[in-house]
Amino acid sequence: MIIESKKRIRREYQPLTTAVSLKILTPASPAGQIYDPENNEYIPDREITPLTILPQVFADAADGSWTAHVANRLLASMKWYVNNVDIATLPSWAGLYSIESTGDLRGAITIFRNVPVEEKIELHFEAVIPDMRIGVNIPIKTETILLSTLDKAEDTYELSIGDDPVMKYNPFYDRLLMYDYKVANGI
């Protein structure tokens, strides 16, 4: 009689280390805009030149067991947040953004919305990387990026003196005027 015994070979994996950053992929459309009130236009106009931001996700394990160093292809549960609110739940953003769901650009957001001058937008990205080696999900969260618009209105200048706004001048106390009078008359 042959007795078979099954033995498990356990492998210990090093933990996954991750690095995340945000990269603007559109040099013609930066995070900041300029609003020209005379022509009623945004520079750049994101309806014409949209802004694309990529969350770059890098992952590695010290033992070399992780092969996907650029981990964007593996991202799951991707969400972009506008001022700490999920962008998918905001009606003011409906149809004004798209999120890439395939390839090395997975997770990249393309924004077609102009930011009003009075509004500041803090944008950040959250997702998970499934680590199949040990069966856990590694959470990913980026730093925030600020989207804002500068008003290009005419500058208003004002000139003032740092002293009393009402200047008082008494010619009788002005000794220079007395000196000029004496020199002119030979006194």
Regions found by a protein language model. Give the residues of each.
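Ser/Thr/Pro/Gly-rich low-complexity disordered regions
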Residues: 1-187
